[in-house]
Regions:
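Domain-scale selection of a single, long terminal region
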Residues: 1-6, 55-59
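Compact nucleic-acid interaction/catalytic patches
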Residues: 3-10, 15-47
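C-terminal terminal-subdomain/extension
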Residues: 51-96
């Protein structure tokens, strides 16, 4: 498993935001990908990404730890936006 890989967990797409440095751990930190429509977008905190031909927002404020075995197979990878996603984690945890 690697940072920015996408999985489907219980019908929800999630992106792995955990550094690969901790790849041997039994858990991974993930954030859900949501359609912008029903979810509020906060500047800096909910970066937009393209995946599977659609535009999503990464809901960093919904971070969760998931057992790696519960993630299942990778269904893809987010190719851009890494810096924006990690900056959003900083905003959530440090306030800037």
């Amino acid at each position: 498993m690697a940072q920015l890989e996408v999985f489907k967990v219980g019908g929800t797409l999630v992106v792995d935001v955990q550094a690969d440095l901790f790849g041997l751990d039994v858990t991974r930190v993930v954030a859900p990908l949501r359609e912008k429509g029903p979810y509020v977008s906060f500047p800096g905190l909910t970066p937009g990404v393209d995946f599977d031909g659609r535009r999503w927002i990464v809901r960093i404020q919904e971070l969760a730890s998931v057992t790696a075995g519960d993630l299942g197979p990778t269904i893809g990878r987010i190719d851009g936006g890494r810096d924006d996603i990690l900056r959003a984690v900083d905003i959530l945890t440090r306030g800037f």
